[in-house]
Amino acid sequence: MFHHADKGGKKSAFGHPVCGQIILSIILLRPPLLVTAFPVNTVEEQICKDPGFPEHGIRTPSIGKFFENSVARFSCADGFSLKGPAKIICTRFYNGSLGWKPSLKPVCLSEDCLPPFIEDADVTNRTYRPGDSLIISCHEGFQIRYPDTETMESVCQADGTWDNQPTCQGCLRPLIPPHSYMNISETKFSVPVGTVVHYQCFPGYKLEGPELLECMYNLIWSDTPPRCLDVEACSLPPMIEHGDYTCHPHPCDRYIHGTVVEYYCYPGYSLANDYKYITCQYGQWFPQMQLYCVKDETTWPGFQDSLLTTWKVVACTATSVLLALLLVITAKMFHYKCKSQQSPSDEPDESRDPNILVVDGVAVPLPSYEEAISGNYCQPPNDLPPDGLESAQHSEEQNPPSYPGHTGSQNSVPLDTGDVENCDSLSDTSECLQGLQPSSSHPGGLNMSEKTNAITSMEETASTSPSIDIADEIPLVEDGEEDC
């Protein structure tokens, strides 16, 4: 219990009034020192941890302890640049602990600039020192562009970055109008010079504007993109009796622009004309023509079988005609061959007799065709020797033989100077004929009775008839008398 001095100048409990007041004031101002006891910080808690040294860098101070509010400074060796804060301070935080502020630890990096990645370009060098210029080449159809069009150069900075880094550009990907598509992938943001873009509209829309756009050398498009406008759909296509239609594309949900309708007829019917398609164009069917199915006049259930049967009939008919013609030709050829190759021995007995020509009642025997050709008439067949035969043939060639009725003519020449007698007078005619006619054993010769009758008739006629001159123009044998 404290006792204060009264107004009468009494002393306080401490013996002096002024000292008592000072002590009381100290106690009242510092109550925690007397009432509450806080723990005392250790030595480790009174300093900051060593921040270390950056690689290829320097720290100041390099040694010592860092108490509260101590400062550490950093720098890098030549050829490297500092990344991060250049100085840090040892600071006490709200929880009473000490730490570095800012907390980011600095590092020293190489000052060489790494090659940048530039789309649609190739970088020539792999490393660049500060102050070096970037060297690139753009792909074909792309052109180099710099952010700063006045500098037109990219330089490696001291901190390893590039200044005024360029890009390789083509024409920027054009816009795609609604309800349309084009032949450029959505992943491409630029296209090289010379690229042609083809625009097309979805079904039910028509294109308004240029269909093709080209990327020009100045990296702009040749024209503005087109638009796709909605068009009116066509109404139901006209129906046909005994037939139906189908749509392309199938199914026919809506007859939009470009829809094609194909007509067909039921079995037993066919279209009246060959055209069977109509197309929806801008809300109208084209061509505007009436299609209808007509009944087939003749149905062919098995067209292939009937076609084969028809060919069989035609082939059989042609074969029959050819065979008939071949038979006729063969028969005709055989007929001519038989006529040309028939021998005298094959003739009947009536034709074996020599032909006799009656002139003014005189029967004149004529030589056969073979005898006239060979020139052996009035020559005994087996009596002449070879020499006489040659002279007789020579005489025959110079002077033709005399016919009965010629008397003492200057053209009459002896047939032979040998044993053969001349036939100069009608009195010797019988003897001449008897010697000239072949024997009865020779084919085609006359029998004795026929010879006698012929000779008697000639002798009787020769005495009363004048000399007979037979013209040389009379044919010996008619060509048409020999038949097969």
UniProtKB/Swiss-Prot annotation:
Enumerate the Gene Ontology biological process terms: chordate embryonic development; regulation of complement activation
Q: Where in the cell is it found?
A: Membrane
Stretches with biased composition (Acidic residues): 470-484
Looking at the UniProt entry, the stretches that span the membrane are 311-331
Cysteine pairs forming cystine bridges in this chain are C48-C90, C76-C108, C113-C156, C138-C168, C171-C215, C201-C228, C234-C280, C265-C293
Q: Where is the Sushi domain?
A: 46-110, 111-168, 169-230, 232-295
Composition bias type Polar residues, residue spans: 424-442, 449-467
Write down the membrane topology: Single-pass type I membrane protein
Signal peptide start and end residues? 1-35
Pfam families, alphabetized: Sushi
UniProt-annotated glycosylation sites, renumbered to this chain: N95, N125, N183
Note the superkingdom of the native organism. Answer: Eukaryota
Positions of the UniProt region annotated as Disordered? 374-484
The reply on keyword Transit peptide is no
Return the SMART domains for the record. CCP (SM00032)
Q: What happens when the gene is disrupted?
A: Morpholino knockdown of the protein causes defects in development, abnormal locomotion and increased mortality. At 3 days postfertilization morphants have abnormally (delayed) developed eyes.
InterPro entries xrefs: SUSD4 (IPR042985), Sushi/SCR/CCP_sf (IPR035976), Sushi_SCR_CCP_dom (IPR000436)
**Which keywords are on file for this protein?**
Disulfide bond, Glycoprotein, Membrane, Repeat, Signal, Sushi, Transmembrane, Transmembrane helix
Q: What is its main location?
A: membrane
| GO cellular component terms, semicolon-separated | membrane
Query: What protein name applies here?
Result: Sushi domain-containing protein 4
Q: Which organism is it from?
A: Danio rerio (Zebrafish)
Q: Which gene encodes it?
A: susd4
